[in-house]
Amino acid sequence: MTVFNKFARSFKSHWLLYLSVIVFGITNLVASSGAHMVQRLLFFVLTILVVKRISSLPLRLLVAAPFVLLTAADMSISLYSWCTFGTTFNDGFAISVLQSDPDEVAKMLGMYSPYLCAFAFLSLLFLAVIIKYDVSLPTKKVTGILLLIVISGSLFSACQFAYKDAKNKNAFSPYILASRFATYTPFFNLNYFALAAKEHQRLLSIANTVPYFQLSVRDTGIDTYVLIVGESVRVDNMSLYGYTRSTTPQVEAQRKQIKLFNQAISGAPYTALSVPLSLTADSVLSHDIHNYPDNIINMANQAGFQTFWLSSQSAFRQNGTAVTSIAMRAMETVYVRGFDELLLPHLSQALQQNTQQKKLIVLHLNGSHEPACSAYPQSSAVFQPQDDQDACYDNSIHYTDSLLGQVFELLKDRRASVMYFADHGLERDPTKKNVYFHGGREASQQAYHVPMFIWYSPVLGDGVDRTTENNIFSTAYNNYLINAWMGVTKPEQPQTLEEVIVHYKGDSLVVDANHDVFDYVMLRKEFTEDKQGNPTPEGQG
């Protein structure tokens, strides 16, 4: 019998096994990192062969279940990241997943049903391969020894890597060991979750750190500062910036009271990094979570302000996330479950407290986070049809505008000011199932271009700057802008809003979802353009 005939006979008998190996290999080569591919493939094949030789069906299924589910989940995550963002999964995505609350995860899963189907298909495929006991395959002893050799070699290599890391950093990290070992297994993406868990522990260790600042405090004539952080807001969908639909009538009605930033850009296209960049001393080029304690809340506290953090983004995992490490420093924190308007009663209560004391009140909105159709009450919809994604997104913008109008109404008779900006923008591609989505690798300008303005109460008169700023200004410098806005600065910082803007305008460096730094100006304007700025075939017409 020729080699070809032997192979054909083997393929006919074990075609599901061959198919699963091919699917596993191609998926990991295309949508995941190719690192340690030989070890991962051997681990996958040998595990299947070992399990198939377990004679007891209940025991075989018990052993197979975690392997099958983890492998299918890992591959589905890789496919999601590659197909949606054009990049492999990484620790930044893992951090975002770990910092998402269950409600948000459930909503997002509903949007990405193809990847749930991929998970189900892969699980069934691998289970179909494993479920049949097959005596024609090599014995458990042979495959078990080979699998043990692969695991031992991988563990030894991971230990070597962790030892070198510990030697360089003078500290051993079990997360580094776990992360490295995962790269040799079919569960490659677990390495990113191990790194995210390491970041979580680092955040826990520094969250309670309160630095002492040498502060310069000046009287701005303002007693109440309301900082509103929007979520996933596109400038291109706001009539304030020229959009054809009237999505921002309340803000436009206040145009004479507003200092508008026409070219504000976010430092990153996802919340877990963009918000800390905006509210702390962290920076695009020198990202380090040890910068997080140097934040606007700690500065305001030391300056004698009463501080509040009111959020409609779930309190799930309140400790150990980037945003909550800042929020927890506020004197009062409130998390509501529901639509953004539920924050308004808490804002009213905060305004009534200690009326003689200066206040910084932060409202962290759910805004236009995907899925936008769930971001507002259906009774608030003004654009139809309500199941159209563009209408839903525009309704979410209109809903936020309505909330801003109510905030202005609460503050119009006070010596108050409101700063509003969005954490990041969103991409738009009408050819995709989910038209709006976060920026990924080498995101377009739309993922970064955000709305930003400062509203001043009419009570403050004409002594404040309401001119329009047309230069690029990165929200990565908003901590300095907010400090100057409050009149609470460090000696080495620009002291006034004008000084901050003059000093940092034009700095257009941004980081993408792959942690690579780009010049915003050089990015394609829209997602549907290629990297040279030409419309793609799908984006034409």
From Swiss-Prot:
Membrane topology of the entry: Multi-pass membrane protein
Example of a GO biological process term: lipopolysaccharide core region biosynthetic process
Chief location category: membrane
Membrane-crossing residue ranges in chain numbering: 61-81, 111-131, 142-162, 265-285
Top-level enzyme category: transferase
SUPFAM superfamilies: Alkaline phosphatase-like
Known EC number: 2.-.-.-
Cytoplasmic-facing ranges: 82-110, 163-264
One GO molecular-function entry: phosphotransferase activity, phosphate group as acceptor
Superkingdom of the source species: Bacteria
Keywords: Cell inner membrane, Cell membrane, Membrane, Transferase, Transmembrane, Transmembrane helix
Pfam families linked to this entry: Sulfatase
Compartment list: Cell inner membrane
Gene3D superfamilies xrefs: Alkaline Phosphatase, subunit A (3.40.720.10)
Similarity-based family: Belongs to the phosphoethanolamine transferase family.
Name this polypeptide is given: Putative transferase YhbX
Gene that specifies this protein: yhbX
